[in-house]
Amino acid sequence: MTPLRFPSNLPLRAVAFDEDQSMPHRRPIDAANDFVRRHIGPSPQDIAAMLATAGAGSLEQLVAETLPYAIRHREPLKLGAPLTESEALAHMSELGAQNQVFTSLIGQGYYGTILPTVIQRNILENPAWYTAYTPYQPEISQGRLEALFNFQTMICDLTGLDVANASLLDEGTAAAEAMALAERAAAKNAKAFFVDADTHPQTIAVLRTRAEPLGWRIIVGNPETGLEGADVFGALLQYPGSSGRLSDPRAVIAALRKKGALAVVAADLLALTLITPPGELGADIAIGSAQRFGVPMGYGGPHAAYMAVRDSLKRSLPGRIVGLSIDSHGQPAYRLALQTREQHIRREKATSNICTAQVLLAVINAMYAVYHGPDGLAAIARRVHRRTAVLAAGLQQLGFAPTHGNYFDTLTIEVGDRRDAIVARAEAENINLRINASSLGISLDETTTPATVEALWRAFGGSLDYAAVERDAGDALGTALPAALKRTSDYLTQPAFQDYRSETELLRYMRKLSDRDLALDRAMIPLGSCTMKLNATTEMMPLTWPEFGSLHPFVPKAQAAGYHALFERLETWLAEITGYDAVSLQPNSGAQGEYAGLLTIRGYHLSRGEPHRKVCLIPSSAHGTNPASAAMAGMDVVVVACDAHGDVDVDDLRAKAEAHSADLAAVMITYPSTHGVFEEHIREICDIVHAHGGQVYLDGANLNAQVGLARPGSYGADVSHLNLHKTFCIPHGGGGPGMGPIGVKAHLAPFLPGHPAEGEPLNGGLHGGGTVSAAPWGSASILTISYIYILMMGAAGLKRATEIAILNANYIAAKLHPHFPVLYRNPRGRVAHECIIDPRALKTSTGVTVDDIAKRLIDYGFHAPTMSFPVPGTLMIEPTESESKAEIDRFCDAMIAIRREIAQVEAGRYPIEQSPLRHAPHTAHDVTSAEWTRPYPRTEGCFPAPNSRTDKYWSPVGRVDNVYGDRNLICSCPPVEDYALAADYARAAE
C-alpha cells in the first residue's frame, strides 16, 4: 500500500534523542504545546468556568481533593519536551526507515496480502469505523454488526461449521480457547490434550502456557500414530500443516470421536476455498487466523482470529456472537447474542477471560471477501497454489525435492549443510525464508510474483525461467492437491458477497453501514471504565506505512531495528509513568494482560518453592475478567466485600488475608476503584497483602486518572496491565484491537512472557511467564499509536490530560447531582475520572429503567454511559479529557431533559409504557408513520433537543428485542430481508 506522507522539506534530523533515550529533545518553541491544546477539549476559559461549577479554585486544589496525599507523585515524569505533530511524523519516518521490508516467505500463520485501497481508505483509515465502541448498544451499532455478521457468515461457509464468533485475538489464543472448550464439552474426564507436531510453534507455546496452570498435559506428536492409547479430551490438527504437509484428517477425527474427544482443526482460510472444509471432515471446532484476508502482517498484529463450532457447542463458544433479531417495529435488527454465556459474566467459574474481539480487523476481513467474492478468493488461492507448484517443479530441477508431495502454499526443503549459503543468497535477494535445523520453509502468498519465484531459484543456486518451468511441468502442476481433499461445496453465495463487486457499489455499501453507527466522530461516548478519548489523526498515520505494516513477526531482528527502538523507548516511558521496573508488550488485550500479570505472580511463588499459594482476593466490585483471569491462572478466588462507600472493606480484606495467609497468592484491585473513587487506604491494602506473602495486582483499566499524578509501582503495587486502547489512545475499533502490556517490579521481571521466536524452549518447559500471544510483541503495529501519543504530549501534557479528565468528571457530577444522585464520592466529595449516577429510586416510583434512559439518549444523539456496572441499575459516566465543555454541557442537558421526562411519568402525564422513554429510540419510521397514537407529540419523541433538527442522528432500528433474538438464534446469512416475513409469522404465532 502507498503510505500517506507529510511535506518532504521537514528537517528529519531536527529530532535527536537524549542520552537516556527517554524522549526526543528539541529547541522549545510555542508550537510544542499545540498538540496538547488540540488533544484536550476544554479551553482555559472553559476550565475556569468548570472549576467554579465543581467548587474548586484551581486544578491543583481539585487534584489535591481527589487523590490521597499519600500516593501523589511529586516529581515531573522524565519524558522530556513534546514534539509537534510534523516533528513526530518526521521522527516516525526515521524509525520506519530503520526497518527493512523484505519479501517474507516465512509463513507460520503470517502472509503477505494486498489490502484493497478502497477498504484501507474507507474502513481502516475512517474514524467512523475505528473510533466506535463495542456494539453493546445494538440500535446505534447496526453497521458494524452487519459487517461482523458477514464475517461470521464467511467463517461458517469456509469452515463448513454451523456457528462462528465475531473474532478472537490471534490464532494461538484461539487454539487455547478451543482447548478449553473441548475440555468442558468432551464426553470423557481426561486431563490431556493432543497437539499435532506440525502445528505452528507459537501456537504450541500458547497451548502449553494455558494448560500448565490448569493441570492439563500437552502431548505433541504425530496424530496418525500418537493418538492410539492416549487418554485425551481433544486434539488440535493443523490443516494444512505448518510445514506445508496436506493430509486427510478424517481417520484421525473419527478415532477422536470414538474416544469421546473433540477434534479441533486449525485451518488456513485461503486454502479452504480449494480444500475440503473442517466441518465436512467431521471436526467439532475450527480455529485460525483471518490475517491473509487483507490485513498487513504488522510485525505480528493486530489480526482477527476466528472460531467456528458445530451447533451443539454454540453456548460454549467464547467471545462475542452477532445474531439477528427484530426491533420494536418487527423489522430485522442485529445484536450481540447469548451474552449471558460470555466468560467474563461467569467470573470465577469461567474457563476463559475473553471479553473482547478484533472487530476492526474482522470488518476488514469481511470486506475483503465482499470485495473479491467467492470467485475472486478462489482465483487468488489457485494462483498462490499454482506458483507454489511451479516453484516446487523448479526446485526439483535444481535437485531439491519438497518433503511433502501434497501441499497448498508451503514447501519444506531438506538442504543439509547448504542451508546457510541458501539463506545468504535469499537475503541478498531481499527474501526471508523459514529456517529450520536442516531444512528451509517457503510459503507463497497473494503478493508472490513470477519474479519472486525466479529469485528463489537463484537462492537455491539455479537460474530458471518461470514461464519455461511452468510450461514444462504441464499437468504435473495439478497433482499437489489430493482429489479426496478438493472442495466441492459452495460458499459465500449470499448477496453480500455478490452484489458489491464494483468499487462504486462497495464504497456506497461501506458508507451505508458507517452511517448507521454512532462513533466518536459524531458524538461523545461517555462510557465509564472505557476511556473513549481522542484518537488523533497524526497518531494513526504511521500505522499504514509499509515500513511498519509489511514486516513478518519472525524476521531477523536486524530487519526490525526501528520497531525495536520503538519498543525499548515505549517500555522505558511506560515504566517511568507507572513506577515499575520492567514492561512486557506481548499481551494483546487488557484481559490477556491480566492473565500475563497473574502468571508472573504464579511464577514468582513457584520459584520460591511455594506452589500452594493459589488464593486470589478480589473485591466484589471487580470487573468479571478479574476472577476469570485468576481462574485461568490456576488460582482460587476469594471475594472481598465492599463497604457502603464503595471502597474495599479493609477489615474484611485483613480477615481474609489472615485466614489464607499460608496460601495467599495475590489481591486484584482496580484503582481508582470501579466505583470511580480513589480509595484512601490503597497503601494499607498493599501492606496487608504483602505482610501475608501475597503480591498486589493493580488493574490498570483506570490509569487515565493517574498518569503524571500517581504511579502504582511507587505506592505498593507489584504488577499492572495497561490498557493502551484506553489511556494511550489506541482506538477501540468497534470492539478491538486493544493492547494490554504489563509493568512489573524487579522481582517479577524474570517471569514476564517469552516466545519461541525469542528462544523459548519447545520441549515442554516454560520460561518465565510462558507465551500468552501468538506474536512476540503482540499487536506490534498499533504500538506506534501510543508511542506517538506520548511523543507529542510529553510529561506536562500527559499530566494536564489527567487533570482535565478528573475535572470533566467532577463537573458532570456537579451538574447532574441535583437531578440524579451521584452514588460514590471520596470523603472530600470528589470523584476520580468517572462518576456513577443512581436512578434506581426512579425505577421504584415510575418503572423507568437504565435501559430506557440509555435508549432515550440515542434520540439526543449520544451513546449511553456504562449500564449496571459495577452497581446494577446505575449509569457510570467517563467523559475523558478530550471532550469540550460544549459537548459535555450538551450531554448534561440531555440527561437533565430525560429527568424532566421521567418527572412527566411521575406526574401522571403518561404511563411509562406510553412514554418517549419506553418507545426510544425513535426512528424515521416513527416520524413518518401514517398513524400516531402516543400521548406525546412526534416532535417531542423524535426531536427532543435543539440540535436534533439540524444535526440529527437517526437510529436505523427501533429498540431491539433481545429475548426474541436468543430464542430464535440466527448467526449467519441468508440476507436480512429474508427474515422480515419470518419475523411477521413468528409474531402472529405468538
Curated annotation (Swiss-Prot):
It is an enzyme of class 1 (oxidoreductase). Keywords: Oxidoreductase, Pyridoxal phosphate. One of its GO terms (molecular function) is pyridoxal phosphate binding. It comes from the Bacteria. GO terms for cellular component: cytosol; glycine cleavage complex. The modification N6-(pyridoxal phosphate)lysine is found at K726. The keyword RNA-binding does not apply. Its EC number is 1.4.4.2. It catalyses: N(6)-[(R)-lipoyl]-L-lysyl-[glycine-cleavage complex H protein] + glycine + H(+) = N(6)-[(R)-S(8)-aminomethyldihydrolipoyl]-L-lysyl-[glycine-cleavage complex H protein] + CO2. Its cofactor is pyridoxal 5'-phosphate. Belongs to the GcvP family. PANTHER family: GLYCINE DEHYDROGENASE (DECARBOXYLATING), MITOCHONDRIAL (PTHR11773:SF1), GLYCINE DEHYDROGENASE, DECARBOXYLATING (PTHR11773). This is Glycine dehydrogenase (decarboxylating). The gene is gcvP.
